Every structure is written in C-alpha cells, then in structure tokens.
A protein has these predicted regions:
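Short amphipathic alpha-helical coupling elements at transmembrane boundaries
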Residues: 33, 43-46, 60, 64, ...
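Hydrophobic alpha-helical transmembrane segments of membrane transport/permease proteins
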Residues: 8-59, 152-173
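Membrane-water interface segments at the C-terminal ends of transmembrane alpha-helices
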Residues: 15-22, 52, 63, 127-158, ...
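Internal alpha-helical transmembrane segments of multipass membrane proteins
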Residues: 6, 10-11, 15, 19, ...
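Alpha-helical transmembrane segments of integral membrane proteins
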Residues: 88-122, 137, 150, 164-226
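Membrane-water interface at transmembrane helix exits
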Residues: 16, 20, 24, 28, ...
Length: 226
C-alpha cells in the first residue's frame, strides 16, 4: 500500500505539473503587465526559475512541496505559505464552527424524525432536509445576509471582523457563513441519523426492551441513541 501510495502521489504530481504547464499564458508577463519590457520579463523569469528546463522545474516544485515552500503567488506576489497561514486562522475556525453547528442541528432532528417514523412530522422533516441538501451554499448565504444583516441588522455584512477585537465578535462574524456551510451537512447527517436509528429500533434487543415494559422514549434514549 505504501508503494502504491507513493506511485499514486508521483503520478498525481506529474498530472498537476503538466496541467499548469499547458495553461496558456506566461506568469512573468502576467505579473508585470502587457506593457512590460522584454528584458524585465526575462529577469523575472530567471528570478522565478521559469527559465530552467521543465524537468528541473518539476523537481524543484516537488522539493518545495515536501519542505512547505509553495513559491510566490503570481496574483498577490507574496509567498503562498504566508497567505495560507493568514487565511488558515479564519478558515479553520469557520470549518470547526460549521461542523459543530451541523452536528448540533442534525442529532436532535434525526432522532425526532426516527421517533415519529411514518408520520406527517417525519415526512415534513425529511422534506426540509432534502431542501437543505439541494439549496446552493452561496444562495443560502446571500439569503442569510439579506435577512439577518440588512433587514434585521443582527449581524454585520462587512465580512470578518478579525480576532483582534475579541473572540465573541470574531465568532459573531463567522456565524452566518457557518450556518450557510452547516445547512447541507446537517441535512445529510440528520437523514443518516434517522436511517441508523430506524435500523436499531428494529433490532431484537430493542424489541426485548419494549416487551419488558420499557417505554419507547426510554428505549430510544437508553439503547437506541447509545
């Protein structure tokens, strides 16, 4: 498996490098603009290592990936690793926040749907979860901004406030994006939770617990959810 993984990574790196190479355009000319002098473009190519043979550039690129040197962004002209580090302090808390929200929403919804299997409430919940899966994140995010930031003014529509002003304000800035990301995940998790609980409720030990006089609610909480 290790050998297979190694060759898979090598093959993937070759495909990525070749794909970047065949894209039309010259990075040096793009960075300097269309009015750049030829000698300036040549100097920048040398600085970026674009004047070297493709195989040598591939080896340099792979070595940089292994040691965490991702080069310089052609658009922002800054080291990529620094840009990733700056954005990681926002993206990682946002991902964790969205994961927590999706779990908090999905568990009770899935349990409630399983407890009311075959009833109107169950069909309604499953219908809403299907809508949650189908709604695009960006459209739902715009709807949240319009409702809670523009109309109700509960949140700011100005983007991330930063962690410098406190964790509470930072989390408040991430709330709407986290909800937009959490909705489809919560919908999927709720459906999975419902299906799993329905399977568990049909097991023999659950039937035995009910036959011994344990109420459905207690059987669900003590044995089903566990």
């Amino acid at each position: 498996r290790v050998v297979t993984l190694f060759f898979t990574l090598v093959f993937a790196s070759i495909i990525i490098f070749v794909s970047l190479e065949i894209i039309p355009g010259d990075p040096a000319s793009y960075m300097l603009g269309i009015n750049a002098q030829e000698d300036t473009v040549i100097a920048l190519k040398k600085e970026l290592g674009l004047d070297k043979p493709k195989f040598e550039r591939y080896l340099i690129w792979v070595k940089g990936m292994l040691i965490g040197d991702f080069g310089v962004s052609y658009t922002y002209r800054s080291p990529v690793i620094e840009m990733v580090g700056e954005r990681l302090w926002v993206s990682l808390p946002l991902a964790i926040y969205a994961l927590l929200l999706s779990t908090i929403i999905a568990l009770p919804v899935g349990i409630f749907a399983a407890a009311n299997r075959g009833k109107i409430l169950d069909f309604s919940i499953m219908g809403f979860t299907q809508i949650g899966i189908a709604i695009p994140n960006f459209w739902f995010a715009m709807l949240l901004v319009y409702l809670f930031a523009i109309i109700l003014r509960w949140f700011s529509a100005g983007g991330f406030a930063g962690w410098e002003d406190g964790i509470i304000l930072g989390l408040k800035s991430l709330t709407l994006p986290a909800i937009a990301l959490a909705l489809p995940q919560a919908s999927i998790l709720a459906r999975v939770m419902r299906s799993s609980l329905i399977d568990i409720l049909s097991e023999d030990f659950m039937k035995t617990a009910r036959a011994k006089g344990l109420s459905f609610k207690k059987a669900l909480i003590r044995h089903g959810i566990r």
